[in-house]
């Protein structure tokens, strides 16, 4: 008997789920049961769903896509065929201050592949170029030497000048004017004073900026704390266009793109990566035009139509993306887009490091009324935005729509502090979810990797 599933991989590929897919494994245990192996930390948990209750599966094609060339070849091809600009080697001629912005330790950008090719391209046009690599930490902590060495390798560490951005170092920040939103645009002095500004990065779905990469190298990458906080204000986060995979009408994206233009970001090199963090697609050139091509490719592999259900199972893709609860909000937003109002999200996240943010934890622990919490966020002026407010606001939004049963290694009290229902196995989570929805004919949608899909409502 053949296995038949109602599942969506992308708009172009429906009902073609492969049993050997590296992200999800299904088998027909018996005629009326499907079994899913779902990422959880460095392990996998099994979810068994009866056929009559399975609404569908939302699965990205990203991790099963096979690139036609190696990552290095893809990046080199992109450098040789830029979109919307001359070649970088030609742009480098005569330039005295060249700055290449690179992502920090929190992003799985394959810089060991990309950066040597970018530097070689610059030096082809300008062998004597004074190049500085600027690490775009945004609001994150500083990147350590060990992390830089792991990112770039020994040759770049030994031979290149590397500076780590500090969003609070006022002596090395420069005011460039007002953003369209009214906030002050303040960025790193090295970036502002460069006569050739380049950025490497990667493109993935982003749960309020639409997509990562491109313009984000400037804002939040090398912007001041004040600028980032204003951009992440509650009004922007509440905007219906500030969602995964959406850039048109997205006020956060609009400010970011304006910032990139104001900073004169001349050239980007961005990749799309697979689960092993290897490039499977690359673009280079104009910070908007090249980024558009990259995000269109990504959307073609990741975009799926919502399958409404009473219960939605999601994950954060396992380690290293499910190390804490704060991180796991991203995977929950994929479920938020397809769960029915008043339904249940079962979120699988090892969360071995706990909550992941002091303010994030305290906000939910100390306020039991989610509507009052949301009002506090929305009443806060953009210039009064505080750290992690955006993540808390998004989390509160989805908790107002659905109950979250959180499968993790966390103590029950911590999970309950964050307004969720604790569970420590898939079986326990399903039983609790069924008790909450109180329906005999409940439907379940499964999202094997909530961070790699763009769910269209």
Region spans (language model):
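Glycine-rich phosphate/diphosphate-binding loops that line cofactor/substrate pockets in enzymes
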Residues: 83-99, 124-128, 303-311, 339-340, ...
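C-terminal non-catalytic interaction/assembly regions of soluble proteins
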Residues: 328-329, 333-457
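Membrane-embedded hairpin module used as a gating/binding unit in multi-pass transport
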Residues: 242-319
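Short glycine-rich or small-residue beta-strand-to-loop segments that form or flank ligand, phosphate
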Residues: 97-108, 132-138, 313-315
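Histidine-anchored nucleotide/phosphate-binding helix
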Residues: 108-126, 328-338
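Conserved phosphate- and dinucleotide-binding cores of soluble alpha/beta proteins
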Residues: 179, 188-270, 274-277, 422-423
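An acidic, phosphate/nucleotide-engaging active-site surface
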Residues: 143-211
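N-terminal amphipathic/basic leader segments beginning at the initiator methionine
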Residues: 32-77
């Amino acid at each position: 008997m053949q296995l038949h599933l109602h599942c969506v991989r992308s708009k172009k590929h429906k009902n073609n789920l492969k049993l050997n897919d590296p992200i999800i494994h299904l088998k027909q245990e018996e005629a009326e049961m499907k079994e899913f192996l779902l990422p959880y930390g460095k392990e996998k948990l099994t979810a068994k769903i009866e056929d009559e209750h399975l609404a569908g599966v939302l699965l990205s094609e990203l991790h099963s896509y096979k690139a036609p060339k190696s990552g290095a070849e893809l990046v080199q091809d992109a450098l040789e065929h830029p979109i919307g600009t001359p070649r970088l080697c030609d742009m480098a001629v005569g330039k005295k201050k060249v700055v290449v912005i690179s992502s920090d330790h929190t992003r799985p950008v394959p810089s060991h592949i990309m950066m040597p090719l970018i530097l070689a391209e610059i030096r082809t046009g300008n062998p004597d170029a004074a190049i500085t690599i600027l690490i775009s930490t945004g609001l994150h902590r500083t990147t350590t030497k060990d992390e830089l060495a792991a990112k770039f390798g020994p040759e770049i560490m030994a031979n290149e000048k590397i500076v780590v951005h500090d969003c609070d170092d006022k002596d090395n920040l420069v005011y460039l004017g007002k953003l369209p939103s009214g906030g002050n645009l303040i960025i790193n002095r090295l970036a502002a004073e460069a006569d050739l500004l380049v950025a490497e990065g990667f493109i993935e779905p982003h749960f309020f900026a639409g997509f990562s990469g491109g313009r984000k190298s400037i804002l939040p990458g090398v912007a001041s704390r004040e600028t980032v906080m204003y951009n992440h204000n509650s009004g922007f986060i509440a905007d219906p266009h500030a969602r995964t995979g959406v850039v048109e009408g997205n006020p956060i994206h609009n400010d970011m793109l304006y910032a990139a233009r104001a900073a004169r970001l001349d050239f980007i090199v961005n990749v799309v990566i697979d689960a092993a963090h290897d490039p499977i697609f690359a673009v280079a050139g104009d910070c908007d035009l090249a980024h558009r091509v990259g995000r269109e490719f990504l959307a073609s592999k990741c975009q799926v139509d919502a399958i409404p259900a009473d219960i939605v199972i999601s994950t954060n893709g396992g380690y290293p993306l499910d190390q804490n609860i704060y991180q796991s909000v991203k995977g929950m937003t994929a479920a938020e887009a397809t769960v029915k109002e008043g339904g249940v999200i079962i979120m699988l996240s090892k969360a071995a490091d706990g909550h992941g943010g002091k303010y994030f934890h305290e906000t939910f622990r100390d306020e039991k009324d989610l509507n009052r919490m949301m009002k506090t966020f929305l009443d806060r002026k953009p210039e009064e935005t505080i750290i992690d407010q955006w993540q808390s606001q998004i989390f509160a939004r989805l908790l107002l729509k659905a109950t979250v049963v959180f499968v993790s290694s966390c103590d029950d009290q911590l999970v309950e502090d964050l307004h969720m229902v604790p569970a420590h196995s898939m079986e326990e989570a399903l039983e609790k979810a069924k008790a909450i929805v109180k329906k005999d004919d409940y439907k379940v949608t499964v999202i094997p990797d909530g961070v790699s899909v763009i769910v269209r409502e």
